[in-house]
């Protein structure tokens, strides 16, 4: 499942976050890389324990937890503290797959990376290149979204960031351990949740079919969830 989540942050929130981030102590992105990633990555990152990263990360997590589409799609058990990167001219990130297990630098908690998420913090017209390209069974998906929008995709996906040729691409990236480990089951639950919500707008909320479908949804969630 690959899903665009629009307007996670408002434009005012994006401006606030960018003002904080732009003043932060950016470093070579390979400071946080393992051997394999260091050969592929060419970008800058904000130290995960910096005051700026923690401040903006808290804003993002609060916005995510209040976003119905994100919650329905990800069914998050744990959200890794958001990280931040930026790509200037000539920078990119070659094909790679994200690590299966990550340690949260803020809480120290380990989590399984079921879903990866990129939240764009620069407008598409502010830079050339810098597209996120995610590969799945159906081919390559090229992603370049408005500032404040996010893309959610399985962490098993091969992906890369194309070289920036003009301007600067700033984004937040993070991982989610879902209550539902399996992507296919998670996708089915999202489809069912969306269908129930659509039907609820067309019939009475106490309609027997709606109540029955809602019960099926929660019983499947109960059967599949890992808490």
UniProtKB/Swiss-Prot annotation:
Any stretches that span the bilayer, and where are they?
Answer: none
Cofactor remark: Binds 1 Fe(2+) ion per subunit.
Q: Does the keyword Transcription apply?
A: no
What's a GO biological-process term for it?
Answer: intracellular iron ion homeostasis
Origin species, per record, is: Caulobacter vibrioides (strain ATCC 19089 / CIP 103742 / CB 15) (Caulobacter crescentus)
Tell me the domain of life: Bacteria
Name used for this protein in its record: PKHD-type hydroxylase CC_0027
Q: InterPro entries from the entry?
A: Oxoglu/Fe-dep_dioxygenase_dom, PKHD_C, PKHD_hydroxylase, Pro_4_hyd_alph, Pro_4_hyd_alph_FE2OG_OXY
PROSITE patterns, per this entry? FE2OG_OXY
Binding site residues for 2-oxoglutarate = 169
**What is the enzyme's class at the highest EC level?**
oxidoreductase
**Chain residues that bind Fe cation:** 96, 98, 159
Q: What lineage does the source organism belong to?
A: Bacteria, Pseudomonadati, Pseudomonadota, Alphaproteobacteria, Caulobacterales
Q: Which PANTHER family match?
A: PKHD-TYPE HYDROXYLASE YBIX
Keywords (A to Z) from UniProt: Dioxygenase, Iron, Metal-binding, Oxidoreductase, Vitamin C
- Name any cofactors this protein relies on: Fe(2+); L-ascorbate
Tell me the ranges covered by the Fe2OG dioxygenase domain, including all copies. Answer: 78-178
- A GO term, aspect molecular function: L-ascorbic acid binding
Q: What EC number is given for this enzyme?
A: 1.14.11.-
